[in-house]
Amino acid sequence: VIGGDECNINEHPFLVLVYYDDYQCGGTLINEEWVLTAAHCNGKNMEIYLGVHSKKVPNKDVQRRVPKEKFFCDSSKTYTKWNKDIMLIRLDRPVRKSAHIAPLSLPSSPPSVGSVCRVMGWGTITSPQETYPDVPHCAKINLLDYSECRAAYPGLPPKSRTLCAGVLEGGKDTCGGDSGGPLICNGQFQGIVSWGGDPCAQPHEPGSYTNVFDHLDWIKGIIAGNTDATCPL
């Protein structure tokens, strides 16, 4: 996260740290057995850590899990920059709630443009040179109209299942290593960090986030055991 500050140790009990291959992502615990992240965070040898704040000085209640099952909209190959960058992971065993571990509920109402949103993650705090922090950083950004992202990235289709968020003057943004983490607007879990400008946090180059609300039926269906649940087109 660029332009943020160290998160409060008690404000992110739902934030998970995902390692795969040699990369890292964020993710969000949505109940004791399920984590929501980005499809592009899929890889071999995935490890999921819950209850982390400082990587160097771990909390006593850190728990480690591996995926038992992974679910994608159609397949792990169909996501694009503007569609289906979402992955639901069933953990190998449920986690115990503790001081630094608790789920974040799914949104009860759709996102509204203009809301103030919070982003968080262990991603780089500088760009284009990368500096990875020991603790997660948090920043406030705004939910922007999708047209702002279309203006910045001409390849985007007229409509998509993504949210556009950032600050138009630049300086605050998610960045490499934050992918898969949550976008929390007006207290509700509305987006999953997907992609953005390179370098990060440039003026008029907001970030793109998978729209969680649009995928609720699919998420709830999979968790309920309906493996035929379909993603919105």
Curated annotation (Swiss-Prot):
Name recorded for this polypeptide: Thrombin-like enzyme elegaxobin-1
Domain of life assignment: Eukaryota
Keywords: Blood coagulation cascade activating toxin, Disulfide bond, Hemostasis impairing toxin, Hydrolase, Protease, Secreted, Serine protease, Toxin
GO cellular component terms listed in the entry, alphabetical order: extracellular region; secretory granule
GO molecular function list: serine-type endopeptidase activity; toxin activity
Pfam families, A to Z: Trypsin
Family per similarity comment: Belongs to the peptidase S1 family. Snake venom subfamily.
Source species of the chain: Protobothrops elegans (Elegant pitviper)
InterPro entries attached to this UniProt entry: Peptidase_S1_PA, Peptidase_S1_PA_chymotrypsin, Peptidase_S1A, Trypsin_dom, TRYPSIN_HIS, TRYPSIN_SER
Keyword Cell membrane: no
Assembly and interaction partners: Monomer.
EC number(s) given by UniProt: 3.4.21.-
SUPFAM superfamilies linked to this entry: Trypsin-like serine proteases (SSF50494)
Lineage start: Eukaryota, Metazoa, Chordata, Craniata, Vertebrata
Positions annotated as active site in the UniProt record: H40 (charge relay system), D85 (charge relay system), S179 (charge relay system)
